[in-house]
């Protein structure tokens, strides 16, 4: 498996390369007033507005630092509205996005019902990065928030 590694706080995580649409540098985002702390803003991407979620905030409770290695990882995520089908884009802000790694062995981690996005660990890589399942990353509260963005681009 090929995976893109990043950091959230002190832990190392990865997203399967097949889930990554594009990796972008950190750019100025359109702020969203009164949004939850994990929502960094909206990004213009391929003629659409897509939400940007701070993975450090979501996974660790901190704030993603502004470093040269901070990137926006654009992934596909399912529509949040039951009336819509297909996929949409979502940008995940992460730090330390510098390594594309190949791993041959994965092992399950702890199953945490509140964190369905946490996947298996890459056991043949230093620091045992844990896979993030992009389609499960948004908690229900954020999924509901983005329904309106989905509907506005129909």
Where are these regions (language model features)?
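An acidic, low-aromatic, low-complexity terminal/linker signal
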Residues: 1-154
